[in-house]
Amino acid sequence: KKWYLCLFDKTQADLNWDNPHVREELKNVIRFWKERGIKGFRFDVINLISKGSYDNDYEGDGRRYYTDGPHVHEYIHELVHDTGIKDMITVGEMSSTSLEDCIKYSNREREELKMTFSFHHLKVDYKDNKKWELMDPDYKKLKELFKNWQLGMQAGHGWNALFWCNHDQPRIVSRFGDE
């Protein structure tokens, strides 16, 4: 049975990380850049690389089938170790994941990623949970989220990267400032 999965855009197929040949080609890409002197890598939505079974279960929006999947830690560990980038800076963008899972990805003893970043703090001004419909930010909630994530990551020996926005978000000055 064949299918075409595209979580973000119909022109961007999700790679089948269950296929060992795909994983080997991704390792070759990393080796290519490493040989040219790159000192680190940012992995986009890396926690979505392992998919669960979709068989006849259509409840919800489907995130539980493609977020933090059954082989994600195995695949990241393999990628990092087989390419020799264990000591490089590696940061993974995390979509729809939890503090506990971010700790797993970045805990130094697990030897997966050096740091992660997630978007929980950027939802404090979403109107009706919609990214492009904004309201005044809830600064108390923002402060609480930062505090909980920083203390939680520290306690779990993880490391999260702090940021205000990226290409997936409305401009920061439009949200938290005055143009």
What feature does the model see in each segment?
Residues 1-179:
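Active-site and adjacent substrate-binding regions of carbohydrate-active enzymes
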